[in-house]
A protein has these predicted regions:
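Extracellular/periplasmic metallocenter environments
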Residues: 45, 54, 67, 104-144
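C-terminal motif of bacterial Sec signal peptides marking the signal peptidase cleavage site
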Residues: 21-23
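Short, Lys/Arg-enriched N-terminal segments with co-localized hydrophobic residues
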Residues: 1-6
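Bacterial lipoprotein signal-peptidase II cleavage site
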Residues: 25-32
Length: 144
């Protein structure tokens, strides 16, 4: 009988502990470091593992599956990803309006990473190597 009373007292404590631990497990990756996204580029495409990212620090890994050198430029802009204006002095590249950062000159077969601090809003990823944007190397994503 005494064991039943002890068990009844223990059950709510175990239930609360389980809820607390599961809540920590769900948010642990966000607290454990930057979110991570892989961007894969090749002639003439850009793919992301996810196109909605959390605000804060995000690790971008640029994987070059192509045969040419590519770069990743992150632009914070409300312009559509296919409407970034060309540079006046060099129409083979686009203006890097609202640039947050970039990972430059990733040669074929290589991967480079960097961490960027993103605030909520609309973004565009581009490859701004000569004529790569015009060939379709751009993609929109959102930070919430």
């Amino acid at each position: 009988m005494k064991g039943d009373v002890e068990m009844k007292k223990l059950l709510p404590i175990v239930a609360i502990a389980t809820l607390v631990l599961s809540a920590c497990a769900q948010t642990g990756s966000a607290q454990g470091g930057p979110a991570k996204v892989t961007v894969t580029m090749s002639e003439w495409s850009v793919k992301m593992t996810q196109t909605t990212l959390p605000a804060g620090q995000v690790t971008f890994a640029l994987k070059n599956d192509g045969k040419l050198t590519h770069e990743l430029a992150i632009l914070k802009t409300d312009l559509p990803h296919n409407k970034i204006p060309a540079r006046v002095e060099d129409a083979t590249k686009v203006q890097e309006i609202g640039i947050i950062g970039e990972i430059e000159d990733v040669e074929a077969g290589l991967t480079k990473t960097d961490v960027f601090d993103l605030v909520p809003g609309n973004y565009v990823l581009i490859c701004n190597e000569v004529s790569h944007y015009q060939a379709g190397m751009h993609l929109a994503f959102v930070v919430k």
